[in-house]
Amino acid sequence: MAVALQFSRLCVRPDTFVRENHLSGSGSLRRRKALSVRCSSGDENAPSPSVVMDSDFDAKVFRKNLTRSDNYNRKGFGHKEETLKLMNREYTSDILETLKTNGYTYSWGDVTVKLAKAYGFCWGVERAVQIAYEARKQFPEERLWITNEIIHNPTVNKRLEDMDVKIIPVEDSKKQFDVVEKDDVVILPAFGAGVDEMYVLNDKKVQIVDTTCPWVTKVWNTVEKHKKGEYTSVIHGKYNHEETIATASFAGKYIIVKNMKEANYVCDYILGGQYDGSSSTKEEFMEKFKYAISKGFDPDNDLVKVGIANQTTMLKGETEEIGRLLETTMMRKYGVENVSGHFISFNTICDATQERQDAIYELVEEKIDLMLVVGGWNSSNTSHLQEISEARGIPSYWIDSEKRIGPGNKIAYKLHYGELVEKENFLPKGPITIGVTSGASTPDKVVEDALVKVFDIKREELLQLA
């Protein structure tokens, strides 16, 4: 599956749209000539293109009208029970069930496994996959497309590919929506899709199956509130992540900060260098955030009123810390009594993300020899599980499937910031205790397959000693 399909945005020239009142109110637009649909490469240094629409275009009204249209579905097609039975056969694990029924700890030979008390498929992911499966059953003869990977897990994405659900192709860094025809069905993934892509699909009159996680749409509602109150959205996330791209498309003015270091820089700029001295000139600011700000962003004018939002898969504690920093920054600049006019906050932290992070914080306090973190290598929430374990100094191995283990006692894994590492003899000799967790997009069966590989290595070790 091409990496270039991630982080997609539309670039639309303003002259390609004209007014049409019946679609989304007085500010609606209709297409007059061909769209140029660009996709970023996923490169950290690549720009994240944005749609250029009339200033009167109301994304909230458009989305509301879209959800009420006959060609839109976000609740499935009445095949939930049989679909969940199929998913249960494909994705569940007897080993993990044994762990859960035995207090999340169990031993197989020389291997004791301690399982995090919250792990794996979250409700939003299970719902997205279920609806995608239902769509295939509901439309057995139609061509099914998806605007991006349904979730960040190679096993699930391959399964949908086998079901003939195709990802919109990319040529010359451009997403080719021209392949989509009127009678086709297009699935929006769990991360959501930008309002620009929704507009194009609605314009084509295709059947839209929306699997966007409700927690993601909650963030969209938050940035729309920021926009209504003329607050700039400070989005804690990765500017080239699909979810953040979609969220930004619903915002007014925005800036995306990846971590506390970038948040400190922004707050130092707001305070004129009186926070920690990390910021510099306006020109340097604009260069630093050139791929992470809204069109026409001016830090001197657009950081007077700010609201916090987040990519739902980021570290909960860091999002909260950034929010507190922004609030205290506004207190320092404008006075405690005036802070409500300069800072606004709504809780947009995903319960599932929080639960999985809390569970691994608990697990790293256990006595374990190593941590096995299972999840897609492009999964943001899984990277943070790895980060938490690494920070505690535990040997931690982030793999996306059992294929990363072997031959023999060897593993290929990623560190939380993405570096690929290979290690020989990663399993210590003798009895071992391993911690196990998995990202919110990871089926239990993938974790089981990895554990079976571990058991096989330790079993071979015992046979050699016999």
Swiss-Prot record:
It is an enzyme of class 1 (oxidoreductase). The active site is at E243 (proton donor). The keyword Cell membrane does not apply. It catalyses: isopentenyl diphosphate + 2 oxidized [2Fe-2S]-[ferredoxin] + H2O = (2E)-4-hydroxy-3-methylbut-2-enyl diphosphate + 2 reduced [2Fe-2S]-[ferredoxin] + 2 H(+); dimethylallyl diphosphate + 2 oxidized [2Fe-2S]-[ferredoxin] + H2O = (2E)-4-hydroxy-3-methylbut-2-enyl diphosphate + 2 reduced [2Fe-2S]-[ferredoxin] + 2 H(+). Binds 1 [4Fe-4S] cluster per subunit. Its EC number is 1.17.7.4. One of its GO terms (molecular function) is 4-hydroxy-3-methylbut-2-enyl diphosphate reductase activity. Residues 1-38 form a transit peptide. Its cofactor is [4Fe-4S] cluster. [4Fe-4S] cluster binds at C122, C213, C350. (2E)-4-hydroxy-3-methylbut-2-enyl diphosphate binds at H152, H241, T312, S379, S380, N381, S441. Keywords: 4Fe-4S, Chloroplast, Iron, Iron-sulfur, Isoprene biosynthesis, Metal-binding, Oxidoreductase, Plastid, Transit peptide. InterPro entries: LytB/IspH. Enzyme of the plastid non-mevalonate pathway for isoprenoid biosynthesis that converts 1-hydroxy-2-methyl-2-(E)-butenyl 4-diphosphate into isopentenyl diphosphate (IPP) and dimethylallyl diphosphate (DMAPP). Is essential for chloroplast development. Homodimer. Belongs to the IspH family. This is 4-hydroxy-3-methylbut-2-enyl diphosphate reductase, chloroplastic. It comes from Arabidopsis thaliana (Mouse-ear cress). The lineage of its organism: Eukaryota, Viridiplantae, Streptophyta, Embryophyta, Tracheophyta. The gene is ISPH.
